[in-house]
């Protein structure tokens, strides 16, 4: 990579409300609220401040069903006041919350490390190839209904991989490696391709910089 003559890679355009990203669109600016998502007034007010400061997407956490349901009120409050900013719901641990949030926001972020797999316990797990395939089928069976909800509501998704929350299953098979991070994403991305769902954003991050160097063949 020539760091002094950088050029953007050609990417697919992803529809996120009325503010698409990727393709020939400019790099978008997103910020996240730190309000309680059940506090409609505070969340709307902070989202407005983000937009007024130049934010193009506003992300809110949705820890549970109640928070996900209240995204409808936050969205309505913003639109009522003329703020058409796309909202992004941040989901961890509970795919049912993602199902609800997808009905009220323009994009939903899921974490592959805890969307279907159990919370990380740092245990080494042994799988036969057949058992591993069964685990992948569980992901497929849970993820496809979510994609169908997103299709119905024109909701984009972000597959957001965190090195710190890779599942025990991925860690046991691939180790603490860039390949494990990539495969955690690809398990979900392959399903998106199979289901012809293209409004997908990908993020892969790690706090350990020595870990995020990914070789060209992997990329």
Language-model region placement:
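N-terminal amphipathic alpha-helix/helix-capping segment at the start of soluble metabolic enzymes
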Residues: 1-31, 151
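Glycine-rich tight-turn/loop motif centered on a GG-T
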Residues: 4, 105-142, 169-180
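Structured alpha-helical segments in the cores of large, soluble enzyme domains
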Residues: 17, 40-50, 98, 146-152, ...
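Active-site mouth loops of central-metabolism enzymes
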Residues: 25-42, 87-93, 170-180
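Hydrophobic faces of well-ordered beta-strands that scaffold small-molecule active sites
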Residues: 27-33, 58-60, 87-91, 108-110, ...
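Glycine-rich, proline-tolerant flexible connector loops at the mouths of alpha/beta enzymes
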Residues: 34, 55-78, 112-131, 200-207
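Alpha-helix-loop-beta-strand connector modules within alpha/beta enzyme cores
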Residues: 67-88, 138-152
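Residue-level detector of conserved catalytic or cofactor/ligand-binding positions
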Residues: 210-219
